[in-house]
Amino acid sequence: AFAYRDCTPYDGTFLIYKEMFAVLLYRLTRSYWKKQHICLVCEKFSSMAQDNGYYFFKHCMEKNEQSYLNKKILYIIDRKSPDYPKVSPYSKNVVPFMSLRHMCSLLAADLIVSSDSKYHAYATQCRHSIFNRYIKKKKSVFLQHGVTALKRVDSIYGKGNRSACDLFIVTNTMEEKIILDNFGYEPAEVANTGFARWDVLKDCSQDSHNILIMPTWRNWLDSVSDETFEDSTYFRNYMLLLNSGHFNEILEKHDLQIYFYLHAKFQSHLKTFHAASNRIHVLSFDDTPVNEMLMKCRMLITDYSSVCWDMLYQNKPTLFYQFDLDQYNEAHGSYIDMRKDLFGDRAETSAELFDYIEEAAEHDFALKPVYARQRSEYFQFKDQQHSRQICVAIKRRFC
C-alpha cells in the first residue's frame, strides 16, 4: 500500500543541505548554545499563537519566568502565520520556523513545551529529516490542546509511544486519574495545573445573546470527498439543525444568535454548510480565535469536543448533541460513560436538543445545580494562575 501527503515547502534537497549546515554550525558553536539552557515553546505545526503554548510563553515573558526556570524561553512560529503579530512584543524570544536559528536552537534545547507533541517543533512530516533523531531524545512537556476524557488518545500520547512526553499537564482530578490509569505514566510525570489558556478565560457574555455550536471531527470522514461528506449522517444532522424552521422560531423568540464553528479538520467542507436564517452564522477557522468565542457565548452546543471544559470552567452550560454516539465510541472511544457522566444535558435528536435550548434560555443560561456540583469537584483551583503552576511543575520535574 502507498501513503500520500501534500508536498510542503520543506520537501526537497535544499532542506537536506540546510540541515547538514545547521548541524555543522551547531557543533562548531556548541558551547555558546548550551550555556543558554534553551526551552522551546510551540503549538500545532509551529503555525499558531492561540492556545496553551502561546499563553504559557506570554506568561513567561511578562512574569520573568526565565529567571525562575533558569532557561532561555523561545517561541517557534512560522513567519507567515496570521498570529505572528501577537508574539512581536517579545521579538527577542521569537524564532522563525525552519530558520537556521530555529535549527540550532532545537539542537541545543534542554526542553520542548508544546500544546501538541514535541515533533510539532519542527517540520518532521518530512520523514527523511535527520532532525527526527535529535527530537526523539529531547525532554518534553505536553500542555495539551484539550482535556482528555471524551476521546481515547492513549495509543498516541501514552508512555512509550512516539508522541509520549516527560511531563503531562492535566486540568482536573478526573483527568489526572484517566492519565494515570490508561497512559502508563507515574504520578511524578503528571501535573494537575489547569490549562495556560485559562489564565485569560473569563465570562464576557453578560450582554450577549450568542450560542456557539462547535462539533468535533470524525475519523471515518477524514479526507473524504465532498460527495461522501454530504451523504454522511454528520452533515445531514447539522444541516437539518441549521435550517430547521422550529429552531429559527426559538432563536426569534429568545433573540438569540447562533455561531457555527466547524472543526479545523473539516474546514475544506465549510462551503457545503449554509443556513437560511440570518440569525445563524457559519464561521471559518480564521474568523475568530476559539478562546474569544467561548468567552462571548452564553452556551455551547457540541457533540464530543473537549472545549466543553472551557465552558464549565467559566460556569456556563453545555448541551451535548450526540446523534451518533455508538458509531463514535466504536471509532474513537471514550474514557467516560457519556450516557451518564457528562456535565450537561444530552440530546440524541434535534427535537430533544430544541427542548433543552428553550429550557436553558428560559433560565437565563444558568448552570444547573447538579452540573455546578460536578464543577466544584473536578477543578483543583480556578485562580487563573495556571501558567505559574505549570512553571512550578516544570521546575520540580526538570530543574
Residue ranges and their predicted role:
Residues 1-2, 6-14, 23-26, 30, ...:
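C-terminal amphipathic helix plus adjacent low-complexity
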Residues 37-201:
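Active-site and donor-binding regions of nucleotide-sugar-utilizing enzymes
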Residues 39-44, 115-117, 144-146, 213-226, ...:
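Short loop/turn segments at strand-loop or loop-helix junctions that form parts
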Residues 50-57, 191, 196-272, 347-349, ...:
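Conserved catalytic-core segment of nucleotide-activated headgroup transferases in glycan assembly
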Residues 93-100, 281-286, 342-356:
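Short acidic-hydrophobic, aromatic-tinged amphipathic segments that line or gate anion-handling sites
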Residues 95-105, 264-309:
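Donor nucleotide-activated moiety binding/catalytic core segment of transferases
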Residues 125-146, 229-240, 315-327:
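A short, gly/pro- and small-residue-rich
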Residues 187, 273-275, 306-378:
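Catalytic binding pocket for nucleotide-activated donors in carbohydrate/polymer assembly enzymes
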